[in-house]
Regions:
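Short, small/polar residue-rich loop motifs at catalytic or cofactor-binding pockets
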Residues: 13-14, 78-81, 142-144
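Short hydrophobic/glycine-rich mini-motifs in sensory/regulatory modules
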Residues: 52, 150-160
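Juxtadomain coupling helices with adjacent low-complexity linkers
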Residues: 66, 70-75, 108-113, 158-191
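Intrinsically disordered, low-complexity terminal regulatory regions
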Residues: 17-94
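A generic structural motif
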Residues: 33, 99, 163-164
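Single conserved hydrophobic/aromatic residue that forms the stacking wall/gate
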Residues: 1-13
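A short beta-strand signature within small-molecule sensing/ligand-binding domains used
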Residues: 133, 139-151
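Structured interaction and signal-relay segments at domain junctions
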Residues: 73-137
Length: 191
């Protein structure tokens, strides 16, 4: 039985007491995992507050590279003229170029999450009518998209997305290669 109450604008959830099993595991209720978008195998940080409260926090491998991701996105955008986004598994953590402020901190679209789950890079274009929304409520108004998944230790850790707006230049192939280079670079930074 889960009890919910609103505190300000945040939802607080109280659950019955949980026991630690013989292997040191604690079960996180399904409703809480669903609300927080915690999937099976999602990395979590565990630490203790000053008042000896155990805190579990979603861990973003790519999020730990936020500063370097922002610098890389700016460089890539400057070179290609494309809007560049770097995403972890949940949101856009860095962006540069046209309309980039509309993307930073926004939750990823289901379509982008599916691409990341498949761990395959992809190229989409307006003329082929294959563009996908990058974030929820995105209109996908660019000419082409190159999406390269950041794979670390065999798992999808995030993605690099290039959105090309110049319809005259056929930069899609170049954009795909650059997005792949960015993904490789960021995967190497993860260790």
């Amino acid at each position: 039985e889960i009890h919910e109450r609103l505190v300000g604008s945040e939802m607080c959830i109280r659950d019955r007491t949980r026991r630690v099993d013989s292997l040191g595991r604690i079960v996180i209720p399904k409703e809480l995992r669903r609300m927080l978008h915690i999937k099976e195998g999602s990395p979590l940080e565990i630490y203790m507050d000053a008042d000896e409260t155990i805190v579990l926090k979603k861990y973003s491998q790519v999020g730990s590279l936020k500063n370097i991701s922002q610098a890389y996105a700016q460089s890539l955008s400057k070179v290609t003229g494309a809007m560049v986004c770097v995403a972890d598994r949940d949101e856009i953590i860095a962006a540069a170029g046209k309309n980039h402020k509309n993307y930073i901190g926004k939750a990823l679209s289901k379509e982008l999450e599916n691409i990341m789950d498949k761990r395959k890079s992809a190229l989409y274009s307006k003329k082929d009518d294959t563009l996908i929304p990058v974030v929820k409520d995105d209109k996908a108004d660019c000419e082409a998209q190159a999406i390269a998944v950041i794979v670390h230790d065999g798992d999808s850790a995030g993605a690099v997305i290039l959105c090309v707006y110049d319809e005259k230049a056929d930069k899609s192939e170049i954009a795909e290669k650059l997005a792949g280079a960015a993904a490789e670079f960021l995967a190497d930074q993860l260790g």
